[in-house]
Design a protein with these regions (language model features):
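Residues that act as N-cap/strand-start positions at coil-to-secondary-structure junctions
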Residues: 7, 17, 54, 83-86, ...
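Extended, loop-rich substrate-binding clefts of extracytoplasmic carbohydrate-active enzymes
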Residues: 72-122
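Beta-strand-rich recognition/accessory modules
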Residues: 1-5, 40-43, 100, 106, ...
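Beta-strand-rich N-terminal accessory domains
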Residues: 1-69
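Glycine-rich, pocket-lining loop/helix-strand segments that form or immediately flank
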Residues: 29-42, 67-89, 156-177
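Hydrophobic residues embedded in beta-strands of well-ordered beta-sheets
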Residues: 2, 20, 99, 125-127, ...
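Acidic, contiguous internal or C-terminal segments within carbohydrate-active enzymes
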Residues: 4, 103-141, 145-147, 151
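Active-site/ligand-binding surface loops and adjacent short beta/alpha elements
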Residues: 140, 148-198
Length: 198
């Protein structure tokens, strides 16, 4: 576990999965504290690379060619959230308030190198993901994070969105809806919803 700090902010990061295991302001958790179990879904936040979520049927067509993906966890039939959250990352630089980890993946459809940089200032955590395709073919890539927030009556969230995807069977993205219902509109600071939202 790598521990970064700056003023009242503290961040714990693991090289197993490149996950955040905790982020605090003084003693207040800003993300759900991780269990430090080596399992990304027990962490505070994990990286999504080379894409997020699932691909229907574990297959996609890109530039006229079909690509087949293999499930990457025992408990889901899909190639879930890519590989970064399951891999062993390497530390390439570290200071009291900054850390840079890299991960290289060279099996299956995707061959890539991703770097994840963490930086604390007095009042901000900045996390940056950068991925480079190292395969022979051009492929679609995406990056993101899967954060877990503390669930309490005081928890508030704000995130810009102009729409959302309905969830269909097997947690796959369904139809895109441009009209956000009030309980899912986080363009302004709002409490967390009371129902499951994926």
């Amino acid at each position: 576990i790598y521990t970064l700090s700056h003023g009242s902010l503290k961040l714990d990061v693991s090289d197993q999965g490149g996950v955040i295991e905790g982020f605090w302001r003084d003693t207040t958790p800003l993300l759900r504290p991780g269990k430090k179990s080596g399992v990304a879904t027990d962490a505070s936040c994990f990286p999504l690379v080379p894409f997020a979520n699932r691909v229907s049927g574990n297959r996609f067509v890109w530039q006229g060619r079909e690509y087949q993906l293999q499930p990457n966890v025992e408990w889901d039939a899909h190639y879930l959230h890519g590989d970064g959250w399951l891999g062993q990352w390497q530390c390439v630089s570290r200071s009291e308030d900054s850390l840079c980890l890299v991960y290289e993946h060279r099996s299956g459809v995707y061959h890539y190198r991703v770097s994840q940089a963490f930086h604390l200032t007095a009042d901000t955590l900045t996390v940056t993901l950068s991925v480079t395709n190292q395969g022979a073919e051009t492929l679609p890539f995406g990056t993101g994070w899967h954060p877990y927030f503390p669930l309490s009556p005081q928890t508030r969230i704000q995130a810009q969105a102009s729409g959302y995807w309905l969830e269909r069977e097997q947690w796959l993205a369904g139809e895109f809806c441009e009209q956000l219902p009030q309980e899912l509109d986080f363009n302004q600071l709002a409490p967390l919803p009371h129902q499951w939202v994926n």
